[in-house]
Design a protein with these regions (language model features):
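Hydrophobic alpha-helical transmembrane segments
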Residues: 123-152
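Membrane-helix interface/capping segments
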Residues: 54-88
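Juxtamembrane "helix-exit" motif on the non-cytosolic side of transmembrane helices
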Residues: 24-37, 98-108, 134
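Cytosolic juxtamembrane helix at the C-terminal end of the final transmembrane segment
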Residues: 61-66, 143-176
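Hydrophobic alpha-helical membrane-insertion segments
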Residues: 83-116
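Membrane-interacting alpha-helical segments
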Residues: 5-9, 113-134
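Transmembrane alpha-helical insertion/packing segments
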Residues: 1-62
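Loop-to-transmembrane boundary segments
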Residues: 4-16, 76-95, 138-141
């Protein structure tokens, strides 16, 4: 169980980043609903900022783990970023599954699933603009895709950091290297 006790802080930070970005995305999309061009800008900004925050945080965790591994104090665990993303995104996947249930007609869970789908739309506010523009709000597979997207970014960021690959080289330089 050291897998879950070691990265507790980082997993909580992933969840907090999602909540903050959801509020940001929801507020910006609701403020720009009347204007499609502004909604597009806000959707791109919300998704881009979310991807940057998650990728950068996981890159730093991967880089720190690499330093510890080089010093012999850490053994590489390929499942670590995946499990962190699943724990932080448990609400996302649960909500996505409930959205799927909401689409099955005449089920006992229909009302509960619709309530859960609306809660998910609040949790995924940073994707709301893009999904709204694509007119796919009622397609439950879109919400599962959104939940899977966060897992993909988390795994890519961690592995890039662990291998020392940087998409923005100046962002991950030390002070000595910048001068």
């Amino acid at each position: 169980m050291t897998m879950f006790s070691d990265p507790k802080y980082e997993t909580a930070k992933l969840l907090l980043n999602q909540i903050v970005m959801s509020v940001f995305g929801y507020v910006t999309v609701m403020a720009t609903t009347a204007s499609v061009p502004l909604t597009i800008v806000c959707a791109v900004l919300g998704i881009g900022l979310y991807v940057f925050l998650i990728y950068n945080m996981m890159w730093e965790i991967g880089a720190k783990d690499r330093i510890r591994a080089d010093a012999g104090r850490y053994e590489y665990k390929a499942k670590k970023p995946f499990l962190m993303a699943l724990v932080a995104g448990a609400l996302n996947f649960t909500g996505g599954l409930l959205c799927l249930l909401a689409m099955i007609p005449n089920t006992v869970c229909l009302n509960i699933a619709h309530v859960a789908a609306n809660i998910c739309k609040l949790l995924w506010g940073h994707f709301l603009g893009a999904v709204k523009l694509m007119l796919m709000l009622e397609n439950p597979f879109v919400w599962l895709l959104v939940a899977s997207f966060a897992v993909l970014i988390t795994v890519l960021g961690y592995n890039a950091g662990y291998r020392g690959i940087s998409l923005i080289p100046s962002l991950h330089k030390s002070k000595k290297d910048r001068e």
